[in-house]
């Protein structure tokens, strides 16, 4: 079905291109409301594409009225919001019914159609460049000047008929589906005897002409009686300024009302999810680019945080005040109703949308939005599902990294974050451990003083409490993946705590020796991680290494023998890596304990060792 705007559907007898635009937008509204968006998307896009951009700017009409501007502004805003609303309803129905692939595919197709139409409409609303506006007006008035056309001819007809003007055929070239607007307008004006003006026929380039009502320019009505060159230039400049200011005003009003919901729609389709497909991902990216450029921003983080540039774009739009406080707050107003404590699980897309938006908000603007960022993040962390816990910790880590520590300590926010993370230390899920430990360490740096500072007597603090829980978990853990996850992040705690690690030395050494004695597969991941723990302990607690040197040397030598004589499925690369890490540990012990390590290594080399790997490692220790 192809849509045409005719006299029967729109009162265009007293209107111009803006009336055609209003008719197009009303038709889109009707089709979206009836649920025919997917079926009629192509036709609706063609209607928008073929409409000249000048028709979307009331400022291009000489007889601009406030009512006309408000009508265009309201219908543009309502169409965009209705498109977004339909996608929200569709996605909510998918979640409620636990939809399968078919339902999600249908929603993805609907979202693609909605985002494509929103992008196209916003591109039409973007202000036209001033230079282009002047050229268009001059082209519309050029048919009245005899000095610039050698073959310009004027023919006068009966004064009772309505005047008409011959000019370019841009209407049919630019809008094939809406050319009936011009014909209907001409017929209506020819029947209007109130004008009582003589027809004027202008012929240009002999074979290239069309007819339009007198006084109606190609993109709107022109001031009557412009014949002198000087007055024509003055009108062009004044009308160009009026056109541009009105176009800018229209864009600002529409964007302020729709940028938040539009960004939320894009964010929900910015990553791969069950409710997205390749087309919706591309449409979301395209719409985000359109929103960014329309608001005068050079990147998405700038759009979310606010446009603070004093410069102007090529089309002259002042970008400083378009979205001065950023679109993140507007997007959160849209998301807030879906992220309440009782209802947020009904909208699985909302949590991913929030996380995506937060990830693109950078320092120092995250601090300004803490009231919007912190509650949803804590809500996710407190949930019993592992996926939501991980997502919440990721959000908290981004907040910690992008907010000044002093600002986090205001009103006890850092304490709240720590209290939310601390109970998770008792969890034994590898995926959670990998993301929890770095986040916990980051918040401890905010709320606790540096343990390495010696300005006052040291006391057990929250670093020590967290480490005690970690060591308790490690000491009795038998699951390989959990052991590896704990061992992977323990060196970070040791490096931060420094010499205060001495309070936990006995348990640490006991865990290190136990982990070195246990193989966890051909890759020996657990042993390699344990060797790095030992290196961190030696570096931070070197004054006490003499006490534990003998036990550690025995454990390292056993490890070398086990690797050299172990299963054949251990690759040479793994053997070499383990050997290098053992050499590093023995070298550090030698520097701490002096001749004790050297004497032990020398005695072993003099005993005619048969294992080449052990012998090479010991020789390297003496040389280092």
Task: Give the ranges of each region predicted by the language model.
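Alpha-solenoid helical repeat scaffolds
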Residues: 247-258, 273-376, 385, 390-391, ...
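Long intrinsically disordered, low-complexity regions that are acidic and Ser/Thr-rich
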Residues: 139-238
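Alpha-solenoid helical-repeat scaffold
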Residues: 2-134, 238-294, 479-624
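HEAT-repeat alpha-solenoid elements in large eukaryotic scaffold proteins
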Residues: 37-62, 111-136, 212-215, 219-225, ...
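Non-membrane alpha-helical secondary structure
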Residues: 17, 64, 68, 72, ...
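Charge-rich, low-complexity intrinsically disordered regions
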Residues: 2-7, 11-25, 34, 57, ...
């Amino acid at each position: 079905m192809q849509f045409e705007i005719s006299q029967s559907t729109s009162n265009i007898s007293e209107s111009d291109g803006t009336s055609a635009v209003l008719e197009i937008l009303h038709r889109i509204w009707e089709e979206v409301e009836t649920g025919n968006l997917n079926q009629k998307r192509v036709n609706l896009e063609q209607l928008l594409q073929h409409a000249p951009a000048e028709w979307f700017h009331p400022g291009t009409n000489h007889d601009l009225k406030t009512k006309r501007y408000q009508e265009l502004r309201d219908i543009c805003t309502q169409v965009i919001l209705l498109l977004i609303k339909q996608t929200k309803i569709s996605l909510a129905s998918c979640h409620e019914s636990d939809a399968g692939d078919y339902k999600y595919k249908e929603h993805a197709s609907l979202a693609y159609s909605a985002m494509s139409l929103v992008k196209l409409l916003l591109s039409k609303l973007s202000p036209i460049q001033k230079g282009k506006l002047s050229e268009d007006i001059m082209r519309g008035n050029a048919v009245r000047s005899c000095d610039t056309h050698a073959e310009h001819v004027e023919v006068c007809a009966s004064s009772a008929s309505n005047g008409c003007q011959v000019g370019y055929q841009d209407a049919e070239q630019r809008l094939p589906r809406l050319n009936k607007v011009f014909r209907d307008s001409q017929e209506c004006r020819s029947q209007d005897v109130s004008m009582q003006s003589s027809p004027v026929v202008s012929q240009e380039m002999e074979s290239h002409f069309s007819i339009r009502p007198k006084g109606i320019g190609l993109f709107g009505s022109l001031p009557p009686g412009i014949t002198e060159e000087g007055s024509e230039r003055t009108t062009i400049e004044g009308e160009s300024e009026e056109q541009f200011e009105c176009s800018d005003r229209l864009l600002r009003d529409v964007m302020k009302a729709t940028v938040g919901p539009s960004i939320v729609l894009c964010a929900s389709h910015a990553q791969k999810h069950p409710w997205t497909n390749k087309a919706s991902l591309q449409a979301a990216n395209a719409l985000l680019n359109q929103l960014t450029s329309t608001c005068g921003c050079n990147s998405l983080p700038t759009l979310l945080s606010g446009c603070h540039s004093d410069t102007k774009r090529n089309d002259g739009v002042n970008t400083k005040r378009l979205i001065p406080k950023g679109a993140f707050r507007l997007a959160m107003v849209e998301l807030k109703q879906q992220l309440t404590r009782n209802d947020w699980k009904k909208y699985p897309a909302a949590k991913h949308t929030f996380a995506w938006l937060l990830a693109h908000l950078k320092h120092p603007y995250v601090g300004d939005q803490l009231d919007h960022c912190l509650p949803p993040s804590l809500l996710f962390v407190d949930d019993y599902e592992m996926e939501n816990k991980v997502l919440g910790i990721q959000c908290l880590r981004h907040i910690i990294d992008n907010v000044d520590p002093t600002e986090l300590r205001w009103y006890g926010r850092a304490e709240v974050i720590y209290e939310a993370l601390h109970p998770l230390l008792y969890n034994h899920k590898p995926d959670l451990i990998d993301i929890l430990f770095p986040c916990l360490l980051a918040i401890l740096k905010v709320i606790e003083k540096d343990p390495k500072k010696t300005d006052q007597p040291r006391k057990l603090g929250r670093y020590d409490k967290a480490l005690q829980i970690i060591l308790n978990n490690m000491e009795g853990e038998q699951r390989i993946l959990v052991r590896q996850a704990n061992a992977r992040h323990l060196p970070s705690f040791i490096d931060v705590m420094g010499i205060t690690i001495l309070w936990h030395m006995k348990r640490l050494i006991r865990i290190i020796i136990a982990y070195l004695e246990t193989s966890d597969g051909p890759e020996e991941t657990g042993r390699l991680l344990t060797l790095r723990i030992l290196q961190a302990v030696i570096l931070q607690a070197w004054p006490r290494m003499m006490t534990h040197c003998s036990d550690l040397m025995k454990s390292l030598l056993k490890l070398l023998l086990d690797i050299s004589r172990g299963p054949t499925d251990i690759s040479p690369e793994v053997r070499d890596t383990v050997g290098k890490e053992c050499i590093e540990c023995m070298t550090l012990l030698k520097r701490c304990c002096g001749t004790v390590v050297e004497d032990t290594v020398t005695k072993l080399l003099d005993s005619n060792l048969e294992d080449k790997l052990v012998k090479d490692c010991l020789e390297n220790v003496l040389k280092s």
